[in-house]
Amino acid sequence: MSIPADLKYTQSHEWVRAEADGSVTVGITHHAQDLLGDMVFIENPAVGRTLAKGEECAVVESVKAASDVYAPVAGEVIAANGEVESSPESVNQDAYTAWLFKIKPANPADVDALLDAAAYQKVVESEAH
């Protein structure tokens, strides 16, 4: 699976898409869902919640394990995707369209500091060894 070049990434396997309105959309990467296996439960943060960068804010559970999802940037949660909560398997089907939540960043420059696709590819490769 190729890593989309138009997204940003975190060391903890979240993807981040900058939106035209200044918000960011967050999901888990294909690599993360591949490691976790079949998703059975997703809990997103509440809309209106203020997050610190790196804060545990969502949970994804699969048949193999439960994993925390971390806020890639500080900011306020402005949307949560109820569709992935009711159909967690959609993350397995296409991790890059099945987003989890949206954040209005406290500092938009924080998004630029996240990993690009090439840097994230190196993270994935380093974990494979």
Swiss-Prot record:
NCBIfam families: gcvH, PRK01202.1
Lipoyl-binding domain sequence ranges: 23-104
Cofactor: (R)-lipoate
Protein name: Glycine cleavage system H protein
Highest classification ranks of the organism: Bacteria, Pseudomonadati, Pseudomonadota, Betaproteobacteria, Nitrosomonadales
Key word Nucleus present: no
Cofactor, how bound (note): Binds 1 lipoyl cofactor covalently.
Entry function: The glycine cleavage system catalyzes the degradation of glycine. The H protein shuttles the methylamine group of glycine from the P protein to the T protein.
